[in-house]
Swiss-Prot record:
The chain crosses the membrane at residues 4-24. It comes from Lactococcus lactis subsp. cremoris (strain MG1363). This is UPF0154 protein llmg_1186. GO terms for cellular component: plasma membrane. Coiled coil: none annotated. Keywords: Cell membrane, Membrane, Transmembrane, Transmembrane helix. Belongs to the UPF0154 family. It is a single-pass membrane protein. It is found in: Cell membrane. The lineage of its organism: Bacteria, Bacillati, Bacillota, Bacilli, Lactobacillales. It comes from the Bacteria.
Length: 79
């Protein structure tokens, strides 16, 4: 009986560790992406330049704010 209980406890601990590790890594990844978005100012300038526009600094910052706001809103909608 003690052996079955020990094995069951090990399995439960392994599953709990797996799910907690997954949750923690997902949370850290989201935080990292919110702090350092993969789309930076240079990428926005390049994208707008490829569309035939010469963006001003105000336009670049506006696009970045819109992207960050959309990401934050989608993150809060998922919760």
């Amino acid at each position: 009986m003690n052996l079955i209980l020990a094995i069951l406890l090990m399995v439960v601990c392994l599953l709990a560790g797996f799910f907690l590790g997954t949750w923690f890594s997902q949370r850290q990844t989201k935080k990292l992406l919110m702090d350092n978005p993969p789309l930076n100012e240079d990428a926005v300038r390049l994208m707008m330049g490829s569309m035939g526009r010469k963006p001003s600094e105000v336009q670049v910052q506006q696009v970045l704010r819109q992207i960050r706001a959309a990401a934050k809103q989608s993150d809060t909608n998922k919760k």
